[in-house]
């Protein structure tokens, strides 16, 4: 392999942290009011020290289902991946880490959320696909607007 050849490979995908809470069970199982479901996403990346070319990207998915003041369940999943990233131009790195890596990780996190919610006694929650490109562009626009004010 040429030393200057761009390299982007998945080395490993893993769950870094999981949390599931159902603070009002078993009462939440008999509630008739449909809960509102809020989903939050966050992405973080760090270069792994001592492992040349490896970057860890973590996608955190937070889901809360509530009806009024009653919490049906709360889930947080940190789905991580180790990616070998070498000889990628610096200007392409932000999009690679904020768009492409989370796009790879999201289906795994989605599966974990559905499984946890189902094992918690609720109907499995299947999260809708996420357009990380649009989220990235939106964040870039907000950043530009913030810096020009």
Swiss-Prot record:
Keywords: Chaperone, Cytoplasm, Protein transport, Translocation, Transport
GO CC terms of this entry: cytoplasm
SUPFAM superfamilies linked to this entry: SecB-like
Subunit structure: Homotetramer, a dimer of dimers. One homotetramer interacts with 1 SecA dimer.
InterPro entries assigned: SecB, SecB-like_sf
Coiled coil: none
Assigned protein family: Belongs to the SecB family.
Function (record text): One of the proteins required for the normal export of preproteins out of the cell cytoplasm. It is a molecular chaperone that binds to a subset of precursor proteins, maintaining them in a translocation-competent state. It also specifically binds to its receptor SecA.
Protein name per its UniProtKB record: Protein-export protein SecB
GO biological process, one term: protein transport
The organism's place on the tree of life at top rank: Bacteria
HAMAP family assigned to the protein according to its UniProt record, in alphabetical order: SecB (MF_00821)
Keyword Protein transport: yes
A Pfam family it matches: SecB
GO molecular function: unfolded protein binding
Cell compartments where the protein resides: Cytoplasm
Keyword Cell wall biogenesis/degradation assigned: no
